[in-house]
Amino acid sequence: AACCEKESLPVTPTSSDLQFGHLAKTWDEGIPLGNATVGTLVWQRDSVLRFSLDRTDLWDLRPMDSIAGPNNRFAWVCEQVRKGDYLPVQKKFDHPYNALPAPSKIPGAALEFPLNIGKVSSVHLFLNNALCEVLWENGTKLQTFVHADEPVGWFVFENLLDTVSPEIIAPRYSNPDEIAGDNSHAGPALGRLGYKQG
């Protein structure tokens, strides 16, 4: 949800708050907000403000033969390591996953704000309020948070000189160029699941 309130949301600073002089440039360093169901990372991708959105229940849970059966135990993996023969473990888990990475976490979407308002002067995560506040040198302020119990979040801009239209960005479900050279479980495995780009 978006708000256009004139007044700032109340915050209570603490000595444990996270404070930075700029927005993170990568998703994994973004300001985390969330609850047990939904979450977001607040960061800057290229020149846009980006909220990486996710849900804990977005999974591809199609059955995989490789993780079924009696050898689907950590004790079995440890036994192979003790024997000095890790190849059976790779054949059972890694090789099938490289072909079809399921079960797999599916990422949510992103919300991007194409703001041309200059340089960020501060980023503050108020831990007591679970609220992120971003200030720009021109006086623009963003406050955003995720509700503690409900699967919903809010953002409020103040002193925004022009209207801004956020854009919803779907995950890249298919990108053959990335898939061909990827051999990491954290990489673009989503493309190997066979979903059509929406």
Segments the model singles out, each with a brief description of its role:
Residues S8-G198:
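Aromatic-residue-lined binding/catalytic grooves and analogous aromatic/hydrophobic interfacial grooves
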